[in-house]
Amino acid sequence: GSVVFSYKAMGYWPAVLAGLATAFAYLGVAAWEGPAFSTAINYVVEIPKAGKLWSIKGDDVYVSVACVSIIASLIITYLNYKGAKQAAVFQTIATGGLIAVGLVFLTGGAFMGKPEYTKPLFTDFKGFSAVLLMVPAMFVGFDVIPQSASEMNVPLKKIPKILILSICAAALWYMAMIFATSISAPASVRLNGVIPVADAMAFNFGSPVWGKICIIGAICGILTSWNGFLYGGARVLYALANAKMLPEVLAKIH
């Protein structure tokens, strides 16, 4: 991954910095997954608000909601602690759930949506700029693939092809979901909704139940990225320790 690439290109310390930057990037995203998970769960089943901690920009933070994220974090951590095989099985199941719900959403948008919901196709440069700023974040995490190369039962020469293919597939998936959201509901529903994608699916299918089904698919997506970042972060630290760039205790495989 980034550690080996940086080491061969620039030497020891750039490789250390690249590895630590990658690990902290994974940690940052993994920290975001917790609140995202509890928000999604709250859409499906309302979480009781108990034990107010503080408020941030008008939004209250409660112990009960935080506990949901903490429990999910412990489960994901345990799966990764058990080993790569268990994490891979979990990843496969969650990815299947995400794809299934996404295909239902896309099919519903294509057959029941209305083209006029997409108008105006363009407004001003502000909207374009906002999306452009978000796009790089959508592609964070694909370097987990080379990080896990040592545990993949795949010829090393095929890994670059898998990486490029996964990025292209993700780009197509993002575009498909944007299309489905745009054509499934008018702008008023999308802009005023709590979670626009779920609200668009509920509107298109004519029942709030479908919004909850959409969120279940989103939860699968959150769990896959959460699992992937923990897996990738652990492998980055292992690579650094194995190269004597971090304490050797991190290079031990239990």
Model feature map: region roles:
Residues 69-75, 121-184, 210-230:
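Hydrophobic, membrane-embedded alpha-helices of multi-pass small-molecule transporters
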